[in-house]
From Swiss-Prot:
UniProt KW RNA-binding keyword: yes
HAMAP family in the record: Ribosomal_uS17_B (MF_01345_B)
Pfam name, any one: Ribosomal_S17
Quaternary structure note: Part of the 30S ribosomal subunit.
Source organism per UniProt: Rhizorhabdus wittichii (strain DSM 6014 / CCUG 31198 / JCM 15750 / NBRC 105917 / EY 4224 / RW1) (Sphingomonas wittichii)
Protein name: Small ribosomal subunit protein uS17
Keywords on record: Ribonucleoprotein, Ribosomal protein, RNA-binding, rRNA-binding
Molecular functions (GO terms): rRNA binding; structural constituent of ribosome
Gene behind the chain: rpsQ
CDD domains according to UniProt: Ribosomal_uS17 (cd00364)
Length: 86
């Protein structure tokens, strides 16, 4: 079975070697047919602490690394991000 790959935005980079990535998807409402945004947050492994808040990244499913981490960051998608750091 191939590994799942998702694209999302880094919403937190405060922890060591971990980033939180928010992945949004669009679903159609069952009754009304309206397109709705749904999102989910994933904890992903970032070995070198190189990804910052606001960047768009691609994450890949891996074997569990901890209680929450089962994903790792594989690449940066958007290099023109605007980080929220002061």
């Amino acid at each position: 079975m191939p590994k799942r790959v998702l694209t999302g935005t880094v919403v937190s980079d405060k922890t060591d070697k971990t980033v939180v990535v928010k992945v949004e998807r669009r679903v159609k409402h069952a009754l009304y047919g309206k397109i709705i945004k749904r999102s989910k947050k994933y904890h992903a492994h970032d070995e070198t602490n190189e990804y910052r808040e606001g960047e768009t990244v691609r994450i890949e499913e891996t074997a569990p690394m901890s209680k929450l981490k089962t994903w790792k960051v594989i690449e940066r998608v958007d290099t023109h991000a605007t980080p929220n750091h002061a």
